[in-house]
Amino acid sequence: MNQSNSTFKNMSNVNEALIKPFPNSNKIYVQGSRKDIQVPMREITLTDTIGELAEKNAPIHVYDTSGVYTDSNVNIDLRKGLGNIRVSWIKERNDTEILTEFSSNFSNERRDDVQLNALRFEHLQVPRRAKDTKNVSQMHYAKQGVITPEMEYIAIRENCKWQEYKDQIGQKKGESFDANIPDLITSEFICSEVAKGRAVIPANINHPEVEPMIIGRNFMVKINGNIGNSVLGSSIEEEVSKMIWGIRWGADTIMDLSTGKNIHETREWIIRNSPVPIGTVPIYQALEKVNGIVENLNWEIFRDTLIEQAEQGVDYFTIHAGVRLKHVPLTIDRVTGIVSRGGSIMAKWCLAHHTESFIYTHFEDICEIMKQYDVTFSLGDGLRPGCIADANDVAQFGELETLGGLVKIAWKHDVQTFIEGPGHVPMQMIKENMDKQLEECGEAPFYTLGPLTTDIAPGYDHITSAIGAAQIGWYGCAMLCYVTPKEHLGLPNKDDVKQGVIAYKIAAHAADLAKGHPGAQIRDNALSKARFEFRWEDQFNLGLDPDTARKYHDETMPKQAAKTSHFCSMCGPKFCSMKITQEIKTMNVDEIAKINSIQIEMDKKSAEFLKNNSEIYMKKNT
């Protein structure tokens, strides 16, 4: 990864495609109880209905993950990073301190290496840590009944002004499978859910740029997007661009899964420019530190890596602590064995040393680190099935049972925790996964990779997995990890990232509708109304991907006049069902009365026919 200072100077000029506002959309901010709680939303302006059904159409407000990148009033300079919106909240709590240097030996070595000057983020911040080993987690505050600014921010964000449309929704009743979804999300409800462990707020004290969000089954289903370099390619600039691209289209969190060179510097650039929580798999970097030799991994190296990443601002760690020595033989008869990178690393280490992993034996030590920075556990499913033939087997569920025990330990330390899940699971076996996770893990939030519902579609696994994602999201899964078309095939590019995010936004929204989440149907109703009224621009702009919708329409009807026509190229002007229905709706009273009178006469004739034993021909009276 040979990048020069000149390369990063160019990063101040962000690609226009990454930051241009969505069409007919404005970034608005809803203020909370204090001036520094400014909650972003995207307001989509709609055109008026014209003709005999004329009326004004109110703007629609949608949840927005794109940060300031789509705010036309903000100048973006990636070299400087984002504004620290949470810094005053963190300071006010008076339970953290600014360190004089990094606590990680590796971080200090990287800082002092002049050869890295060309790669380094220019404005390194000095890290914070809890004072006197205090606990600074959102769960710790919640258990004390403290409603933090982060919780208030999230309450405003989750409601997304939906009550303004309450009388217009006509929302279909959902099936939430015993979830506890209120009509209105309040700060108190969020505090209660976090205290019970049913929701998490990933918000490291060293990531003050993050816009607070929540993951839990009683909230909107969230999605994660994966990025990261590999030994075969990519650059820091490319990975930062992928992050911005992913959140533009709706990724609620981003995982940096880098396994190539300069992982530390890549992560710093991503975090400093990310308004969404960032997750990592620390064992990847720890393995790089021992030159890829699994047997040489140890607790000291892993501990230093955790501290290094916590002080950079990583919001959640995937930790494969549930892979036990006794589980490894259970995978022998599988078709695809162990497919998790982290899981295979820990399994190999356990076999090499013939003992439990240092992650499992030092789990409480890890908890002590997590609560000093408010890093959230994402307890990894290292033994997830890699094909539908291996779904729901004894190895997978054995690990899940171990994770259930680890959740209780994490909660004892007031460390926020969610659980990772499969994988490849056929549709008829998906609900068992959700039910067992709720039972074993005390309703801690579930986070799944899909699951993929069939193995026959390489190149289309964003579709095979979105099917399972929608299903498990309906059953109660709190966050869905996207899958791109490149899954199993290669490192995704920007276009793959977009396709994966859009597929999973569809799955998450479908799950919200099925659960009956309050306000979930507002956008659907607005788009359906625009479609019926041939307001083409509104149709495009209300969609998850206005660019693609407009492109498909214009391929056959490119002229501007086509944007006001009352038909599309599918049916043409004579066979459009909605045009015909509109004509029916706009008939005048006399026409409708005439039709009704004809119908009355027809009904009379029908009754007469039935009275005469339904005879087609009747004898003539002589």
Swiss-Prot record:
Gene3D superfamilies: 6.10.250.620, Radical SAM ThiC family, central domain. Binds 1 [4Fe-4S] cluster per subunit. The cluster is coordinated with 3 cysteines and an exchangeable S-adenosyl-L-methionine. InterPro entries: ThiC, ThiC-associated_dom, ThiC/Bza_core_dom, ThiC/BzaA/B. It comes from the Bacteria. Substrate binds at residues 226, 255, 284, 320, 340-342, 381-384, 420, 447. It catalyses: 5-amino-1-(5-phospho-beta-D-ribosyl)imidazole + S-adenosyl-L-methionine = 4-amino-2-methyl-5-(phosphooxymethyl)pyrimidine + CO + 5'-deoxyadenosine + formate + L-methionine + 3 H(+). Its EC number is 4.1.99.17. It holds the Pfam family ThiC_Rad_SAM. Zn(2+) binds at residues 424, 488. GO terms for cellular component: cytosol. GO terms for molecular function: 4 iron, 4 sulfur cluster binding; carbon-carbon lyase activity; zinc ion binding. Keywords: 4Fe-4S, Iron, Iron-sulfur, Lyase, Metal-binding, S-adenosyl-L-methionine, Thiamine biosynthesis, Zinc. GO terms for biological process: thiamine biosynthetic process; thiamine diphosphate biosynthetic process. [4Fe-4S] cluster binds at residues 568, 571, 576. The keyword DNA damage does not apply. Pathway: Cofactor biosynthesis; thiamine diphosphate biosynthesis. HAMAP family: ThiC (MF_00089). Homodimer. Catalyzes the synthesis of the hydroxymethylpyrimidine phosphate (HMP-P) moiety of thiamine from aminoimidazole ribotide (AIR) in a radical S-adenosyl-L-methionine (SAM)-dependent reaction. Belongs to the ThiC family. This is Phosphomethylpyrimidine synthase. It comes from Vesicomyosocius okutanii subsp. Calyptogena okutanii (strain HA). The gene is thiC.
